[in-house]
């Protein structure tokens, strides 16, 4: 799902980059040409001594969680190469969307994209598994799963797509339930609650299983939907609820972490394969490390944001009947296993990653 975070300042940058042949400015022109030349030749040219600039783009604004991760990657690559490789981060609301950002990467018009898994579901349907409720136990389970067999399996599938190389995972946040009037403390409190959801088979089935009434609304309609009573609640991390503004029209936060949203750092295969083995290793390891740093940053800052709004007078509940919630949504797993036979094995990988 596309997020808007202080967006607007970079509205036309990515489109302009594509029209200009991928140049993100004078500093990136020679680097882009060098990377493209190596890729076009189909050779394994040793670029380990060459100066270059890597452009990283995402659809969120400066200071967003995506931007934090992209800049962590920038720092790691620049320090790891002793300044030989420069990284330019393009943060802002693009005139396109995340899917088009992925297509730019795939077409070698952009080196690296920082995107959500939703933008990649059309390429790898198994990425839809992140919508399963209570898939992960906690952050430790997330880290071990993404860095182990589960994550490797998904990255391998993605890297088999023509033009795309999956480098690693980043964070899109734990989602909690935010409601305008009704306080949610137990699973029974969900009965009859009109919950905004994406038009997604897993999310719709989940809220139906919980006894709520799912209402499909676009991300940008959440504020007015809550304000006008079209829906009673929505779900997201506190950070994004604040960024998107609808934290101002809810009064309750159910800190339950029922969904975990992930993102993936994708690279242009043509560009990446044109790098030396040394530079490939640096880029890959930096992406993985940046993802780890961003996940830790996101969790800490999201919890701090919840505490901040609790101090402001918001009602914050932390349900203890998690097993009852999981029991309610168990049929969703059975339904999705029937529709997506590969998901059961992937869930087993997650469960084993402890």
Residue ranges and their predicted role:
Residues 1-53, 354:
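Short, low-complexity disordered leader/linker segments with a strong preference
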Residues 23-27, 42-141, 150, 159-354:
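N-terminal secretory/targeting leader peptides
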Residues 145-155:
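Signature of the catalytic double-stranded beta-helix
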């Amino acid at each position: 799902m596309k997020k808007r975070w202080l967006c607007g300042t970079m509205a036309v940058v990515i489109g302009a980059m594509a029209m200009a042949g991928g140049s993100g400015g004078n500093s990136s022109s020679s680097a882009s040409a060098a990377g493209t030349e190596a890729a076009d030749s189909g050779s394994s040219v040793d670029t380990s001594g060459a100066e270059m600039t890597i452009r990283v783009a995402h659809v969120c604004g400066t200071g967003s969680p995506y931007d934090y991760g992209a800049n962590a990657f920038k720092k790691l690559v620049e320090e790891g190469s002793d300044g030989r490789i420069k990284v330019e981060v393009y943060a802002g609301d693009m005139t396109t969307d995340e899917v088009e950002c992925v297509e730019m990467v795939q077409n070698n018009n952009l080196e690296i994209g920082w995107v959500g898994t939703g933008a990649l579901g059309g390429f790898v349907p198994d990425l839809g598994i992140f919508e399963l409720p209570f898939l992960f136990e906690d952050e430790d389970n997330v880290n071990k799963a993404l860095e182990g067999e589960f994550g490797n399996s998904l990255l391998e599938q993605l890297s088999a797509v023509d033009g795309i190389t999956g480098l690693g995972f980043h964070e899109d946040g734990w989602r909690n339930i935010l409601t305008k009037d009704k306080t949610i403390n137990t699973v029974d409190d969900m009965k009859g609650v009109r919950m905004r959801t994406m038009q997604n088979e897993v999310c719709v089935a989940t809220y139906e299983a919980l006894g709520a009434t799912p209402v499909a609304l676009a991300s940008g309609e959440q504020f007015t939907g809550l304000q006008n009573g079209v829906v009673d609640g929505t779900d997201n991390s506190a950070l994004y609820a604040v960024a998107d503004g609808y934290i101002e029209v809810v009064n309750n936060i159910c800190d339950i972490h029922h969904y975990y949203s992930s993102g993936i750092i994708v690279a242009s295969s043509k560009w990446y394969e044109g790098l030396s083995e040394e530079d490939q290793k640096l880029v890959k390891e930096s992406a993985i490390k940046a993802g780890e740093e961003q996940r830790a940053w996101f969790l800490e800052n999201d919890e701090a944001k919840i505490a901040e709004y609790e101090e402001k007078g918001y009602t914050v509940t932390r349900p203890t009947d998690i097993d009852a919630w999981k029991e309610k949504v168990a049929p969703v797993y059975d339904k999705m296993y029937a529709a997506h036979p590969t998901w059961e094995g992937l869930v087993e990988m997650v469960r084993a990653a402890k």
